[in-house]
UniProtKB/Swiss-Prot annotation:
GO BP of this protein: glucose metabolic process; pentose-phosphate shunt, oxidative branch
E.C. code: 1.1.1.49
Classification lineage: Bacteria, Bacillati, Cyanobacteriota, Cyanophyceae, Nostocales
Organism from which the protein derives: Nostoc punctiforme (strain ATCC 29133 / PCC 73102)
Assigned keywords, A-Z: Carbohydrate metabolism, Glucose metabolism, NADP, Oxidoreductase
Name of protein: Glucose-6-phosphate 1-dehydrogenase
Pathway assigned to this chain's UniProt record: Carbohydrate degradation; pentose phosphate pathway; D-ribulose 5-phosphate from D-glucose 6-phosphate (oxidative stage): step 1/3
C-alpha cells in the first residue's frame, strides 16, 4: 500500500504544513469510536509525519482507568479494528502520549482535575497551551460539557482552544438553535468544529474541484441539461448495538439531515468566491435556504419513511427492526427515509433532487448520480438504436471514484447502441485514497481550517428543510401505518411511488 506521502495524485503539489503540538481531549473515550476511528486516525497522521511527535491525547470518561490501562485498551482496539497496522516501535512512542482523566460530564471537580492534568502535560510534552476538546458523547451531554468547559476557563483562548462536536447537532431546529446559543456563549464561531465525517472523504472533497475546475462540466450543471439528481447512502447493517440511540434518532436524524444534506449542498451550491471556509459555507447556506420539500401539504408525495422487516442478508436470516434487542416492539422509528427536494433558484428551478438512505439494504453504497436530460432528437427510434440518458456518478463508497455513462455504437455490421462507462477510480493509483476520513478532519481542525465543518447557520438551515417531515413523523402514529421493506431489499413500495410518480425510477446499485 502506498502511503499518503507517496500518493501519485499529490506529486508536484505542496504539502499542507504541520500543525503546532497540541493536546486532544476526547470526551467519551471509553466508547468504541475512540479505538475504532479516532486514535487510529491520529496514529495514521503520526505515521505519515503529518502531526508533531509532541501531539498528546487525553481520554475522559467515567471509568476509573489509569494512564497505562487506557494505553492498553487503545492498543487492543487497534489490534482488533486495524490488524494490518504496524504497532511496533512507533506505536510505543505514540502511546506514551496517551493519558486518561476519569470524571463525570456534570461534575465541576472532574474538569478542574482535567485542567490541572492539561497544565502538567503542557510542561511535560511541550504543547504550548493548544487544546482540542472532542465531544464524542451522547448528544444530550453536549450542552453540559460545553458549559463546564466554558465556566472552567478551558475555552477562553479563541486562538488556542478548539471545540469539536460530533453529529447529530440537535434533534430538530429548536434544539439546534438552543445548542448553538450555548456554544456561542462560551466560544467564537471560529473555535467551533461541527464534524460530519462524510466531508472528509476524498470524493466528497473532489466534488468542488470536479465541478468548478473543469470547464466541460460546470456549464451543464443546471436545469437546462440536468433532468434530476439522486443521492443514495445505503447500509447493509442493522441497528446493531445502537438501539438506545437509534430509537430516538432514526434514519432522518442519523443520516439524511447531516450526511446526505452535505452531499446535496456540495452538488447544488453555487461557485464560492474563494476556496476558503467561509466562502464555501456561505454558498451551502444559500442553497439550503432555497431548498424545500416538494409538497409539504401532501407529505407522501415528497417524503417517505420505512422500517426493515425480517429478511435475508448474504444468505443469513436477520430479524426485523422491531425485534432487535432494545427496540420497542411498537416502534415507529424509521430505518429508511426518502425525500424529494426542489430548489427555488435560477440554476435548479424545476429539477428534483431525490435523497434516500436506509439500513439492511442489499449493498453498502454511497453515491451522487447526475441524470442528464435525454437527447431531443428522434433519430434513434428502433429498439436496437434506443439511447439512454447520460449519467455522471460520483461514488463515495466503496471504490471511490467518478464515472460517466454515455452511449456508443456496438462494433459490427448492424447499427446497435449500448451504454458504456468512462471511469476514474482512486484504486487505480494503487493507493487507499480514503480511510475513515477522520484523519483529514483531525488535521484540518489542528490547522484551524473550518472548510469541511458546518457553521451554525448552516446547521439550522438544514434542520429547517426537514422540519415539515419531522413535525408529522414525530407525532404518535399507529405502528401498522409505517411502511415495511424486507431486509435485503432496496426500499418500501411507497418510496418507489415517490419517484415513479414523476416518470423516473431509483437506480439499482
Amino acid at each position: 500500500m502506498v502511503s499518503l506521502l507517496e500518493n501519485p495524485l499529490r506529486v508536484g503539489l505542496q504539502q499542507q504544513g504541520m500543525p503546532e503540538p497540541q493536546i486532544i481531549v476526547i470526551f467519551g473515550a471509553s466508547g468504541d469510536l475512540t479505538w475504532r476511528k479516532l486514535v487510529p486516525a491520529l496514529y495514521k497522521l503520526r505515521r505519515e509525519r503529518r502531526i508533531p511527535p509532541e501531539t498528546t491525547i487525553v481520554g475522559v470518561a467515567r471509568r476509573e482507568w489509569s494512564h497505562e490501562y487506557f494505553r492498553e485498551q487503545m492498543q487492543k482496539g487497534m489490534e482488533e479494528a486495524h490488524p494490518d497496522v504496524d504497532l511496533g516501535e512507533l506505536w510505543q512512542d505514540f502511546s506514551q502520549g496517551l493519558f486518561y482523566s476519569p470524571g463525570d460530564i456534570d461534575n465541576p471537580e472532574s474538569y478542574q482535575k482535567l485542567k490541572t492534568l492539561l497544565s502538567e502535560l503542557d510542561e511535560k510534552r511541550g504543547t504550548r497551551g493548544n487544546r482540542m476538546f472532542y465531544l464524542s458523547v451522547a448528544p444530550s451531554f453536549f450542552p453540559e460539557a460545553i458549559k463546564q468547559l466554558g465556566s472552567g476557563g478551558m475555552l477562553e483562548d479563541p486562538y488556542k482552544h478548539r471545540l469539536v462536536i460530533e453529529k447529530p447537532f440537535g434533534r430538530d431546529l429548536a434544539s439546534a438553535q438552543s445548542l448553538n446559543q450555548v456554544v456561542q456563549k462560551y466560544c467564537k464561531e471560529h473555535q467551533v468544529y461541527r464534524i460530519d465525517h462524510y466531508l472528509g472523504k476524498e470524493t466528497v472533497q473532489n466534488l468542488l474541484v470536479f465541478r468548478f475546475a473543469n470547464a466541460i462540466f460546470e456549464p451543464l450543471w443546471n436545469r437546462q441539461f440536468v433532468d434530476h439528481v439522486q443521492i443514495t447512502v445505503a447500509e447493509t447493517v442493522g441497528v446493531e448495538d445502537r438501539a438506545g440511540y437509534y430509537e430516538s434518532a432514526g434514519a432522518l436524524r442519523d443520516m439524511l439531515q447531516n450526511h446526505l444534506m452535505q452531499l446535496y449542498c456540495l452538488t447544488a451550491m453555487e461557485a464560492p468566491n474563494a476556496m476558503d471556509a467561509d466562502s464555501i459555507r456561505t454558498e451551502k447556506v444559500k442553497v439550503l435556504q432555497a431548498t424545500r420539500l416538494a409538497d409539504v401539504h401532501n407529505l407522501s408525495r415528497s417524503a417517505v419513511r420505512g422500517q426493515y422487516s425480517a429478511g435475508w442478508m448474504k444468505g443469513q436470516a436477520v430479524p426485523g427492526y422491531r425485534t432487535e434487542p432494545g427496540v420497542d416492539p411498537n416502534s415507529t422509528t424509521p430505518t429508511y427515509v426518502a425525500m424529494k427536494f426542489l430548489v427555488d433558484n435560477w440554476r435548479w428551478k424545476g429539477v428534483p433532487f431525490y435523497l434516500r438512505t436506509g439500513k439492511r439494504m442489499p449493498k453498502k453504497v454511497s453515491e451522487i448520480a447526475i441524470h442528464f436530460r435525454e437527447v431531443p432528437s428522434r433519430m434513434f427510434q428502433s429498439a436496437a438504436q434506443q439511447t439512454n440518458a447520460n449519467i455522471l456518478t460520483m461514488r463515495i463508497q466503496p471504490n471511490e471514484g467518478i464515472s460517466l455513462r454515455f452511449d456508443v455504437k456496438m462494433p459490427g455490421a448492424e447499427f446497435r447502441t449500448r451504454s458504456v462507462d468512462m471511469d476514474f477510480s482512486y484504486g487505480s493509483f494503487g493507493i487507499q485514497a480514503t480511510s475513515d476520513a477522520y484523519d483529514r478532519l483531525f488535521l484540518d481542525c489542528m490547522m484551524g481550517d473550518q472548510t469541511l465543518f458546518t457553521r451554525a447557520d448552516e446547521v439550522e438551515a438544514a434542520w429547517q428543510v426537514v422540519t415539515p417531515a419531522l413535525s408529522v413523523w414525530d407525532a404518535p402514529a399507529d405502528p401498522t401505518t409505517i411502511p415495511q421493506y424486507e431486509a435485503g431489499t432496496w426500499e418500501p413500495e411507497q418510496a418507489e411511488l415517490l419517484i415513479n410518480q414523476d416518470g423516473r425510477r431509483w437506480r439499482r446499485l
